[in-house]
Amino acid sequence: MLAASFSGPVVHEVAQADPQLATPQHKVRFAVCGMSHDHIYGMVGAIQRGGGELVLAQATEPDKVAAFKKRFPDVRWAANEEEVLHDSSIQLVLSSKIASERAPLGVRVMRSGKDFLSDKPGITTLEQLAEVRKAIAETKRIYGIMYSERLEVKAAVKAGELIHAGAIGRVIQTINIAPHQIHQGAGDWGGASGRPDWFWNDTQYGGILCDIGSHQVDQFLYYTRSTQAEVVASQIANVAHKDHPHF
């Protein structure tokens, strides 16, 4: 980040992240509907830390279901999506389905009277964006997207706090370099296996700028306190994976 108030020598300091709230301030009953990406574990953890109670889960991939059951052995399982949507006791639905399927699910969730939290990218086409905006306007429900790089990384959270407190002056430029491994390491925000077939298809995962670049756009807007942005140039290339022409 480049700030507009540099003066004097640079002083190296360690900024401590604020401790997490010991007691959640809110309570919410939530469900998981679709877990194609392992980001779902970090999403569940974030909601639980905020006072959420995981009461229901639904997914179709056997390996993902087995892993989730091992992590959350007491959760109740729904037979299908409709069971989740028709459960009036649920206030919020989380999903890390295949990226192109998240927005349509979110629209159905909102129209069932529930709020929705999607893994990123939460929307993959302009047509989906229009449908989501329409559903929000008509239902007054929340369509949230978990941008974990800003919301779950302690350094990023602290950076936001310092910026908004005026500690480094006005941010006038942001630069972000975000390499992404093909085979991700273990962890709630990464995943412990290679990319599934859908992750090589740009119509399903949204393309690299939508998938990864959405993180950076979110951060650029937040750190500069902007509400609008214009993309003036972009470039992509498939350098090392010619066997996946739609990557």
Where are each of the predicted segments found?
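Predominantly a Rossmann-like dinucleotide-binding segment in NAD(P)-dependent oxidoreductases
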Residues: D38, I142, L151-H244
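Short, Asp-centered acidic motifs that coordinate Mg2+ and/or phosphate
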Residues: L56, Q91-L92, G144, Q173
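Short acidic low-complexity segments
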Residues: R76-H86
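N-terminal Rossmann-like dinucleotide-binding module
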Residues: L2-F72, A192
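Short loop/edge segments at beta-strand edges and connector loops
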Residues: A79, S118, I145-Y147, A233-I236
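Beta-strand-loop-alpha-helix segment that lines the small-molecule cofactor/substrate pocket
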Residues: L92, I98, A103-L151, G166
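Short, conserved SAM-binding/catalytic segment
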Residues: F68-V75, V132-I136
